[in-house]
Amino acid sequence: MSGNSIGQNFVVTTFGESHGVALGCIIDGCPPGLELSAEDMQHDLDRRRPGTSRYTTARREADEVKILSGVFEGKTTGTSIGLMIENTDQRSQDYSNIKDTFRPGHADYTYQQKYGMRDYRGGGRSSARETAMRVAAGAVAKKYLKQVHGIEVTGYLSQLGPISAETIDLTQVEQNAFFFPDVSKLEALDEYMRELRKSGDSIGAKVSVIATGVPVGLGEPVFDRLDADIAHALMGINAVKGVEIGDGFAVVNQKGSQGRDLMSPLGFESNHAGGVLGGISSGQPIVAHMALKPTSSISVPGQSMTVQGDTVEMVTKGRHDPCVGIRAVPIAEAMLAIVLMDHLLRHRAQNNAVVSDTPKIGMR
């Protein structure tokens, strides 16, 4: 299996399965001298960790990350950083009944057809459990971006099913289990999720992620545009079926006089483009949104088939998130941070000596 790495100068490679012994990742390209400890990653891992909320899966994993290499006396050495998280709460017996049955809406069928076999225990490599290592690697990128360049990455749940955030107060995101920025909707969210659990069904969501402090110039046209790489990274997250940069699909209904971001020496007057122009960062906040489908692991019966081709009625057992969008918030932050870190190092390698006489502007 290829496709386990992302990045060119800041390269993250993950390995491991949902019910395997452990998950791991290798980070190549992190500059030396960055103070780094397991605690720097643990905060974001705890935000993603299962079993911490009644709104997410009941699987309980400590997700305690271990640094295997690349750090000496509390600082990165510039060599490969090896990270590992042990799996401790697998219940593989929950999946014994689907050993020969495909779960509709999951990767079971496609993995079987592509590789001629599959790890049926929780989806194996296709499980969102793998994203724990992306979050760990993203935490390294986030620390470097903030400490060295003042770049901050923040995500939040902007919509869960029919409930959308009408006000965005980022100070409230870490104060509730939904990572939701509109406190006036928390009671409605709680009630909606309770009813959803009773029905045995699941729901989709929209997650937004913003990066502030991003300098002008990141992005490598034509095929390595910054927005293209962001979309690639976010689309690589489990259950994501759509990505928007800036106004996204809303531009379909905009006129040119509405959608362009007017500018003056005082700054940009709007940010419809989401901080990227021509595939290059403009100095405005990077804004991206992603749509996540409802998980197919539900207790509502549905038709499927066996590996032998027989039709069966399927009910998925196990411990699953009724809305995967909640725990996707720190994952989205991690992937955006990894892309920005990679492009920052690439820009520095090629254009560090470039001096422009044009004044830099930001958001007015």
Swiss-Prot record:
NADP(+) binds at R48, R54. Disulfide bonds: none annotated. Keywords: Amino-acid biosynthesis, Aromatic amino acid biosynthesis, FAD, Flavoprotein, FMN, Lyase, NADP. GO terms for biological process: amino acid biosynthetic process; aromatic amino acid family biosynthetic process; chorismate biosynthetic process. FMN binds at R125, S126, S127, N238, A239, G278, K293, P294, T295, S296, S297, R319. The keyword Nucleotidyltransferase does not apply. It holds the Pfam family Chorismate_synt. GO terms for cellular component: cytosol. GO terms for molecular function: chorismate synthase activity; FMN binding. It catalyses: 5-O-(1-carboxyvinyl)-3-phosphoshikimate = chorismate + phosphate. It is an enzyme of class 4 (lyase). Reduced FMN (FMNH(2)). SUPFAM superfamilies: Chorismate synthase, AroC. Pathway: Metabolic intermediate biosynthesis; chorismate biosynthesis; chorismate from D-erythrose 4-phosphate and phosphoenolpyruvate: step 7/7. Its cofactor is FMNH2. Its EC number is 4.2.3.5. PANTHER family: CHORISMATE SYNTHASE. This reaction introduces a second double bond into the aromatic ring system. Belongs to the chorismate synthase family. Homotetramer. This is Chorismate synthase. It comes from Shewanella denitrificans (strain OS217 / ATCC BAA-1090 / DSM 15013).
